[in-house]
Amino acid sequence: GLESRGLGDVYKRQVYDYPIHQNDILPTVAEAAGAQIPNDRIIDGKNLIPYINNEIKTPPHETLFWISGRLKTVMHNEWKLIKDEKINKNWLFNLSNDPTERNNLAEANPIKVSELELMLFNHMKEQSPPVFQSSLSIPVLIDKHGGQEYVEGDEYLYWDN
């Protein structure tokens, strides 16, 4: 969600509960500032102002994607798939039933994994190649903060910078 702090009386402080993406910042700030968005390229984000002002009642995104090297995520409606291609592992969560992502449903739901993988594949085909390749790939423990040590059996994934 989003917490907006107002711009005078125009946009009062409020909390917005639907998922948004960092790509939404540019179109939203540009609209608030009265600036033009470049039309010579695709801008992935959406202007959130009509959503925040309840002019549009539906969520701004049905599907969101995050890509960091070999770590890829797609969130579609209530489902979220995280793929770590380095260790060939998937995590699938039903966010309606498991908002804190504790119960990996990937093995029990191979059809849903395949559906989301196809969405991710199609999204990746539309993307420009990275300008810079990752220079670092580090293991990150799942559900542990950086000060906690790895214990045999802990789950982890690899994050590419």
Q: Model-found features: residue ranges?
A:
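Generic preference for hydrophobic
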Residues: 10, 64-65, 81, 92
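Residue-level detector of conserved, well-ordered beta-strand and adjacent loop positions
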Residues: 66, 75, 93-96, 106
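Single conserved hydrophobic/aromatic residue that forms the stacking wall/gate
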Residues: 1-11
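Short, surface-exposed beta-strand/loop micro-motifs that present aromatic residues
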Residues: 70-83, 91
